[in-house]
């Protein structure tokens, strides 16, 4: 019988308890956007559904205000 290869080590949550999801917190938002500028999925981010919803709204708001690019054209 093969045991699963999961490690017993707990992962750190991607968003710490003190961090607030806000459109002005660009360093936080950049961690959840791919190199192409796409918002990463909830499974890749390891966020709760509420956190993912708030993150999506904040990223879209930052894009409209030109704080984050819609596309990353650095080739």
Swiss-Prot record:
Subcellular localization(s) per the UniProt record: Plastid, Chloroplast
Keyword Amino-acid biosynthesis annotated: no
One term under GO cellular component: ribosome
InterPro entries: Ribosomal_bS18 (IPR001648), Ribosomal_bS18_CS (IPR018275), Ribosomal_bS18_sf (IPR036870)
Predominant location category: plastid
Keyword Transcription regulation appears in the UniProt entry: no
One Gene Ontology term from the biological process aspect of the record: translation
Keyword line: Chloroplast, Plastid, Ribonucleoprotein, Ribosomal protein, RNA-binding, rRNA-binding
Alphabetized GO MF terms: rRNA binding; structural constituent of ribosome
Pfam families for this protein: Ribosomal_S18
HAMAP family the record matches: Ribosomal_bS18
Similarity field: Belongs to the bacterial ribosomal protein bS18 family.
Assembly description: Part of the 30S ribosomal subunit.
The protein, known as: Small ribosomal subunit protein bS18c
Species annotation: Marchantia polymorpha (Common liverwort)
Gene this protein is translated from: rps18
């Amino acid at each position: 019988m093969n045991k699963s290869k999961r490690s017993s080590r707990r992962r750190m949550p991607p968003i710490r308890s003190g961090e607030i999801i806000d459109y002005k917190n660009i360093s936080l938002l950049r961690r959840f956007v791919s190199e192409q500028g796409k918002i990463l999925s909830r499974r890749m981010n390891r966020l709760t559904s509420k956190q993912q919803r708030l993150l999506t709204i904040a990223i879209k708001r930052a894009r409209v205000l030109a704080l984050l690019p819609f596309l990353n054209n650095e080739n």
